[in-house]
């Protein structure tokens, strides 16, 4: 299979947004189950619209890329730069489930690491959750060479 990473074009955005919905649905299902319906609705009721905006903004930022597998959109990735700290952060990324296991995620990370280096950064970072819904992301990031982490927890309560 021929894998190619290219700058995102407008024609790829809707496919990437649909992939984001597919990829993040289990995470938001977990949030709903954990937080309960009321708290979930307060915090994440419009998660799809927020995700749509985030994906659109990231992919059209000039730092957004699409992975093509034999010409078909198979994944996306975008990053941001913190010039002051010299850190590049992978913001969002996903691989279509039908293309998983082909090394596409690793190719996207390597591609973005090169871009981040070219922009003069000395460190790359990514954030993800510690819950089971984020376990595949954690495995992918560790495989990509992210070898240090700071754990965190976010608490909520009703008032």
Question: Language-model segments: which ranges?
Answer:
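Conserved active-site alpha-helix within GNAT-family acetyltransferase domains
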Residues: 106, 130-150
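Short polybasic/polar patches that bind polyanions
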Residues: 100, 117, 142
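Extreme N-terminal starter segment of soluble prokaryotic enzymes
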Residues: 2-4
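Acetyl-CoA-dependent GNAT
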Residues: 7-87, 91, 96, 109, ...
């Amino acid at each position: 299979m021929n894998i190619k990473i290219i700058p995102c074009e407008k024609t790829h955005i809707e496919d990437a947004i649909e992939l984001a919905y597919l990829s993040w649905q289990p995470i938001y299902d977990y949030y709903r189950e954990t937080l309960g319906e009321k708290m979930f609705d307060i915090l994440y009721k419009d998660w799809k619209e927020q995700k749509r905006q985030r994906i659109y903004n990231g992919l059209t930022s000039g730092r957004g890329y699409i992975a093509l597998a034999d010409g078909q959109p198979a994944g996306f990735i975008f990053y941001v730069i913190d010039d002051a700290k010299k850190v590049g952060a992978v913001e969002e990324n996903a691989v279509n489930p039908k293309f998983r296991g082909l090394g596409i995620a690793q190719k996207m990370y390597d591609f973005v690491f090169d871009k981040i280096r070219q922009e003069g950064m000395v460190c790359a970072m990514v954030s993800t959750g510690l819950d089971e819904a984020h376990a595949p992301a954690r495995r992918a990031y560790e495989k990509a060479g992210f070898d240090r982490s700071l754990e965190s927890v976010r608490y909520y309560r009703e008032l």
